[in-house]
Amino acid sequence: MTHTLDDRTELLRELLERQFTEHTDQLTELTLQSRQREHGGHDPDTLRRLVEVAQRGIADTAQALRRMSEGTYGICEGCGQDIPTARLEARPSARYCVPCQQRS
């Protein structure tokens, strides 16, 4: 089955929206754990790092969704070329093609 560009974009949008929800849920859970006496079984430094990862995931996903609405999603911010679909499927929030990512 072949997908049109619009179909693939819609699938990637759905994936990004799911990831946004997952990151938000994770951040909520980690925030609740941080308020517990035992920090949900995590030491405070690990919990802080997990919160930072969840926050970064929310920000990256939100930026990708913003780029979709602006029509710039899938365009490398380094070279201006299209980011290959396989890369976007593997990392939907990608801002760079692989060569530009490796240079940064």
For the regions a protein language model found, what residue spans apply to each?
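Interaction interfaces in information-processing and related assembly proteins
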Residues: M1-E70
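Acidic interhelical loop/turn segments
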Residues: Q36-G40, G78, P84
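Short functional micro-motifs and their immediate structural scaffolds
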Residues: Y73, P84-T85, Q102
